[in-house]
Amino acid sequence: MKIDTEQVIETYKDRIFAIGLTMLKNPDDAEDVAQETFLKYHTYKKDFESKKHIESWLSKVAINKAKDIQRKFWKRKQVSMEDYMATIPFDRPQDEELFQAVMALPSKYSIVIHLYYYEDYSIKEIAQQLKLNEGNVKVRLSRARQILKEQLKENWNDEE
């Protein structure tokens, strides 16, 4: 099974961009991740078993591309996270605060939060994507939740 590249881009562009943004915390780098991921899909010669296989493959490629960017020694001028945040419409102030808290997490925590809660991946699927065992994924999710709980607890209790 091979789906037209334009259709794949239209279907998965937001998801792949979100993976890049979650890991790199920079919209320009996230855009690079998305472009490189879709370019790799376009030139990939083998067929996929299903749409789920395509989705999983794209996520894996995006994660690896983001890791490649993280390994670079130099940084170019980047759009600040604050500037990017100003372009995102949030329904409630708590949504923006939660998003900022997730983005402030170290990437090893933010990526598991993103894949689990925003992409609906299972623990097993996240473990496969990140090349971790399921226990490590559970620990990272637990630690990320605890950090978020501590960060948000004070602010959200003040609003009640």
Region locations from a protein language model:
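A short pre-motif secondary-structure segment
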Residues: 112-116
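Residues within helix-turn-helix
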Residues: 28, 124, 135
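DNA-recognition helix of helix-turn-helix
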Residues: 63, 67, 130-154
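Structural recognition of an alpha-helix C-terminal capping motif at a helix-to-coil junction
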Residues: 18, 32-39, 52-64
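C-terminal flanking helix
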Residues: 17, 38, 106, 110, ...
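Internal acidic/polar
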Residues: 68, 75-102, 122
